[in-house]
Amino acid sequence: MINFQESVTFQDVAVDFTAEEWQLLDCTERTLYWDVMLENYRNLISVGCPINKTKVILKVEQGQEPWMVEGVNLHQSSPESDCPLVDEPRKHRESKDNFLKSVLLTFNKILTMERIHHYNMSTSLNPMRKKSCKSFEKRLPPHLDLLNYNRSYTGENAYECRECGKAFKKKFHFIRHEKNHTRKKPFECSDCGKAYSRKAHLVTHQKIHNGERPFVCNDCGKAFMHKAQLVVHQRLHTGEKPYECSQCGKTFTWNSSFNQHVKSHTLEKSFECEECGKTFRYSSSLYKHSRFHTGEKPYQCIICGKAFGNTSVLVTHQRIHTGEKPYGCIECGKAFIKKSHLLRHQITHTGEKPYECNRCGKAFSQKSNLIVHQKIHT
């Protein structure tokens, strides 16, 4: 066990500066000095360190300044009164910075000594507690509370996450960030039971149930649940094409069309089908594709006996028998067996037309409509 009383003295944690430096401190800094010195003294007494009161402590307890400033009365030197402001020469600014740094170091020393003392007392009463460091730390006074008080004087981020080390200036932002680690979702929808980590997300979700659509297009009157949906829809009226391909310069109205186009430049297709010439990026994709030519269907439905060329198609087919519709529209609640069916349905809400004719630029919401249109050009 560490001999705590022999290893710590008041001088180890005292904040020392000259009378000249004291005269340069402003009201807030002098008040902070009072708090620190008295707190140091009380903390050392509380952990059993025998300390003789120094002249500085006696003066501070009596409401006097450690160093008298010429021309200033005693009653003007208390923390509650207005401190005399002295012009601060540039060469003395470093002294004030060093003072604040020493305050922070002092608080850290006190905190460390208190933890050592409490740990020694705890383990002497119950030696088995040495094996449970984590559980012991949880019973200690919060480390952040004291440090955050100090950081408020230096402008540092006060609230630090113990999980990832990210720091925040505001407690509200810190609490919100912590939920990312704990996965807490306290905001639950009373209609469907779905939970969210933020109240704003719950409010947005509840618009599905009450049918609220506050964002209205000024051109055609169509209403939308989210502002982002309105912005995308308005491109139909303005003709805006914000997505430009850096490879060929072609522009697109919809992000989905743009992403699909970019793949034509970036995807390397090294596996070619000997039957139809279609290329694939992976050999496994080519192997699955070849079943269309051979007619091979190794995956059979156990309910109706229908066979399929790959497992994904079989799984989708079986939903016809089970009635499962896992893909639900957040706008109207309608559910679908296939994800592609959901995506096609959602276009009716957004007004998006991702299928664009290469000849004339006319866009369509359904690919089948584009195919029919292209026959005009051929």
UniProtKB/Swiss-Prot annotation:
Q: Is the keyword Plastid assigned to this protein?
A: no
Subcellular locations according to the entry: Nucleus
Task: Give the GO cellular component terms, alphabetically.
Answer: nucleus
Q: Spell out the Pfam families in the cross-references.
A: KRAB, zf-C2H2
| Gene3D superfamilies tied to this protein | 6.10.140.140, Classic Zinc Finger
Q: Zinc fingers (C2H2-type) span which residues? A: 159-181, 187-209, 215-237, 243-265, 271-293, 299-321, 327-349, 355-377
Q: Which GO terms describe its biological process?
A: regulation of DNA-templated transcription
Sorted alphabetically, the keyword list is: DNA-binding, Metal-binding, Nucleus, Repeat, Transcription, Transcription regulation, Zinc, Zinc-finger
Report the InterPro entries cross-referenced here.
KRAB (IPR001909), KRAB_dom_sf (IPR036051), Znf_C2H2-type (IPR050758), Znf_C2H2_sf (IPR036236), Znf_C2H2_type (IPR013087)
Q: Would you say which domain of life the source belongs to? A: Eukaryota
Q: Name one GO molecular function term.
A: zinc ion binding
Q: Which ranges carry the KRAB domain?
A: 8-79
Keyword Hydrolase applies? no
What the record says about family reads: Belongs to the krueppel C2H2-type zinc-finger protein family.
Entry's PANTHER family? Answer: RIKEN CDNA 6720489N17 GENE-RELATED, ZNF44 PROTEIN
Q: What does this protein do?
A: May be involved in transcriptional regulation.
Q: What is this protein called?
A: Zinc finger protein 684
Species annotation = Macaca fascicularis (Crab-eating macaque)
Instruction: Give the gene name.
Output: ZNF684
